Amino acid sequence: MSQLNSVWVFSDNPERYAELFGGAQQWGQQVYAIVQNTDQAQAVMPYGPKCLYVLAQNDALQRTENYAESIAALLKDKHPAMLLLAATKRGKALAARLSVQLNAALVNDATAVDIVDGHICAEHRMYGGLAFAQEKINSPLAIITLAPGVQEPCTSDTSHQCPTETVPYVAPRHEILCRERRAKAASSVDLSKAKRVVGVGRGLAAQDDLKMVHELAAVLNAEVGCSRPIAEGENWMERERYIGVSGVLLKSDLYLTLGISGQIQHMVGGNGAKVIVAINKDKNAPIFNYADYGLVGDIYKVVPALISQLSR
């Protein structure tokens, strides 16, 4: 695989920079990073950028999308071949604005990127995860938002130093204003980084029964995830634990599913696990088509037995 001269990265979520650098270092000879403040600059420095660009006029109420004009002005001057962003809600909103202002091709939620004969090729899901599309980008600049868990994080070198420059703030014609912030209870779990995950679906009859699921997860030293109906229909678990096409994409060593039917929208998120073990009382459940190991049984009988055996 050939490499581009330079790849630029930006993320509104600082935790995603390691993954972005992991991809950028693979696809580009040199990596440049855009960050929102000096604290992020210090955190990103060990990943090995050629230069760091710090966005000016940042404060707690500033919205990421308002930096589109500032970043666009910078990129017009530097002429990179690729801008890589984290595929967050705000990252994709910013990417859309930059695509218009720079007349650049945009691929959202990319699951793979390759450089073939100097051309950038990106893969992404379509039709709700039922298929993958391969896009060959012909514009001088490619803007790509990278799905979480796709790229291995890069290693860090705390001794690395590079120049830091400030990017002047160019106010957009219409700013998005944040008038107030309210605290939101959220899970600190990041399933995309978990080594073992226990997933629960509609086979669970009541919210109180999550207790046995967490007990099993504790024995396995695993995190707990769920299908979309559990998170957004029943509201039994946090949105951060939803596994699926518009949720978390797993890259775990083990994914143990309990009462999950295995619809394609869910398996888009679960299929990245190295080993899938399925427990479902319906022998015709689609999940068994994906599972490396399957057990036809009632989770209310199987899970307590597993906890008992694994606790010995």
UniProtKB/Swiss-Prot annotation:
Instruction: Write out the GO biological process terms.
Output: fatty acid beta-oxidation using acyl-CoA dehydrogenase
Task: Tell me which residues bind FAD.
Answer: 254-282
Tagged with keyword Electron transport: yes
> Which key words are in the record?
Electron transport, FAD, Flavoprotein, Transport
Q: Which SUPFAM superfamilies match?
A: Adenine nucleotide alpha hydrolases-like, DHS-like NAD/FAD-binding domain
What highest taxon heads this organism's lineage? Bacteria
A Pfam family this protein belongs to?
ETF_alpha
The molecular function terms in GO held by this entry are: electron transfer activity; flavin adenine dinucleotide binding
Function summary = May play a role in a redox process.
Its quaternary organisation is: YdiR and YdiQ form a heterodimer.
* Family membership noted in the UniProt record: Belongs to the ETF alpha-subunit/FixB family.
What's this protein's name?
Putative electron transfer flavoprotein subunit YdiR
User: From which organism does this entry originate?
Assistant: Escherichia coli (strain K12)
Classification from the root reads: Bacteria, Pseudomonadati, Pseudomonadota, Gammaproteobacteria, Enterobacterales
